A protein has these predicted regions:
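Enriched for short, Lys/Arg-rich terminal
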Residues: 1-10, 18-22, 26-29, 44, ...
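A short, surface-exposed loop/turn module that caps and links secondary-structure elements
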Residues: 34-59
Length: 90
C-alpha cells in the first residue's frame, strides 16, 4: 500500500520508551530507528494487520514486534507496545 508524499504524525506511548530501556541497547536503537521511519510510510516493512482489531498492526523487527494503530483519516500512527517475539506475538 502506498500513501501520499505527506508524512504522518507519530505518537509513541510512554510505555514504549520504558520497554526500550529494558532491552539490550543495540536492539533498542534498531527499534527506535524503525519507529522514527514509520511516518514516511506506516505500511512499509514486514507488517500484518491484527485480526479482530480494526486499525491495529504489528511490524516484525528482528526478535521483537512493534504494535501500532493507524488512523488514516487523521494520518496518525500510534505506537503503543513493543514485545519480544513469542508464539503469541507472531
Amino acid at each position: 500500500m502506498m500513501n501520499s508524499s505527506e508524512s504522518w504524525d507519530l505518537q509513541v506511548d510512554p510505555d514504549v520508551f520504558g520497554a526500550l530501556r529494558r532491552i539490550p541497547r543495540r536492539d533498542a536503537e534498531a527499534l527506535l530507528a524503525i519507529i522514527q521511519l514509520m511516518p514516511i510510510d506506516p505500511y512499509f516493512g514486514d507488517i500484518k494487520k491484527m485480526k479482530g482489531e480494526e486499525s491495529t498492526w504489528r511490524r516484525r523487527a528482528g526478535a521483537y514486534r512493534i504494535f501500532y494503530k493507524i488512523r488514516a483519516v487523521e494520518k496518525t500512527i500510534l505506537v503503543f507496545r513493543i514485545e519480544p517475539r513469542t508464539s503469541k506475538t507472531y
